[in-house]
């Protein structure tokens, strides 16, 4: 989809760049595939902030997405492509031959009227879902499972994809956008193609208020705080913090590795760049 620029008739329109959504469905989502979602304001069940700078934002309905694609060997037709406020990718409403509706992540070049299927014998066609053992090397994939039957977890954001680069000893080797090479069981499923809305990375919100609509509050720098609030705080006049950058709890930031999951490190063939 193309990007949309605006004439600067107001200051906030001068820098505004949006994705053109004219080809998307303009009505409401399918009610049976939505549910309410409550705001947390970045707080956990104890009321403490666990995700800073969150709060407010427009009210949303959560669209129930089928990441598992468990309806095997039943063909479905794409009814429409929709906007989803809960993610950067677009979603597709599909109708199976038995009459059931479902939402899936919409890959690039999927259009209304196309047929998709989840099957071991499916064609290598955009939107089809197959086990990795049935997919030829070199194929571009998205919504890749990490555990058999858990549902897709890798490459679900706008414009993302992974490449299948090898198969060996019961595992498929995939290359992620980060440059990481990872092993995934061959029985895990993946969908053909890359995710829709690749221009998401080029948008410009144009004003602070548009970020507030998305649920983001102002991001306050540590050097602008008091010493009680942040290790960089305080000082007479404007100061630079006086130390290497740290988090509010005093741990080094800006590049320090924070990954703790040693249990799955054996599946990482090559670390990300």
From Swiss-Prot:
Superkingdom, taxonomy of origin: Bacteria
Entry GO MF terms: rRNA binding; structural constituent of ribosome; transferase activity
UniProt record similarity statement: Belongs to the universal ribosomal protein uL2 family.
Entries under HAMAP family matching the protein: Ribosomal_uL2_B
Chain intervals for the UniProt region annotation (Disordered): 228-273
Biased composition (Basic residues): 254-273
Self-association and partners: Part of the 50S ribosomal subunit. Forms a bridge to the 30S subunit in the 70S ribosome.
CC per GO annotation: large ribosomal subunit
Pfam families for the chain: Ribosomal_L2, Ribosomal_L2_C
Purpose of the protein: One of the primary rRNA binding proteins. Required for association of the 30S and 50S subunits to form the 70S ribosome, for tRNA binding and peptide bond formation. It has been suggested to have peptidyltransferase activity; this is somewhat controversial. Makes several contacts with the 16S rRNA in the 70S ribosome.
NCBIfam families referenced in this protein's UniProt entry, alphabetically: rplB_bact
Keyword Ribosomal protein in record: yes
Gene that specifies this protein: rplB
Entry-linked PROSITE patterns: RIBOSOMAL_L2
Protein name, as recorded: Large ribosomal subunit protein uL2
InterPro entries given in the database record: NA-bd_OB-fold, Rib_uL2_dom2, Ribosomal_uL2, Ribosomal_uL2_bac/org-type, Ribosomal_uL2_C, Ribosomal_uL2_CS, Ribosomal_uL2_dom3, Ribosomal_uL2_RNA-bd_dom
UniProt record, GO biological process: translation
Keywords annotated in UniProt: Ribonucleoprotein, Ribosomal protein, RNA-binding, rRNA-binding
């Amino acid at each position: 989809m193309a990007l949309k620029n605006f004439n600067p008739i107001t200051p906030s329109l001068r820098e505004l760049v949006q994705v053109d959504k004219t080809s998307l469905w303009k009505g409401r989502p399918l009610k049976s595939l939505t549910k309410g979602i409550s705001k947390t304001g970045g707080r956990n069940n104890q009321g403490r902030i666990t995700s800073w700078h969150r709060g407010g934002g427009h009210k949303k309905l959560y669209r129930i997405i089928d990441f598992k694609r468990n309806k095997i060997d039943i063909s479905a037709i794409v009814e429409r492509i929709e906007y989803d406020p809960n993610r950067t990718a677009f979603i597709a409403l599909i109708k199976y031959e038995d009459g059931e509706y479902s939402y899936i992540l919409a890959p690039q070049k999927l259009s209304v009227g196309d047929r998709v299927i989840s099957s071991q014998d499916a064609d290598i066609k955009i939107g089809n879902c197959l086990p990795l053992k049935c997919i030829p090397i070199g194929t571009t994939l998205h919504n890749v499972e990490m555990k058999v039957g858990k549902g897709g977890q890798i490459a679900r954001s706008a414009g993302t994809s992974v490449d299948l680069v090898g198969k060996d000893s019961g595992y498929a080797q995939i290359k992620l956008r980060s440059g990481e090479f990872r092993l995934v069981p061959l029985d895990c499923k993946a969908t053909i193609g890359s995710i829709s809305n690749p221009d998401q990375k080029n948008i410009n919100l144009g004003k602070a208020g548009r970020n507030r609509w998305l649920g983001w509050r102002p991001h306050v720098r540590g050097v602008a705080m008091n010493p009680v609030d942040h290790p960089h705080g305080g000082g007479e006049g404007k100061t630079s913090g006086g130390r290497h950058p740290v988090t509010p709890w005093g741990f080094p930031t800006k590049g320090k590795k924070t990954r703790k999951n040693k249990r799955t490190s054996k599946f990482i063939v090559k670390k990300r760049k």
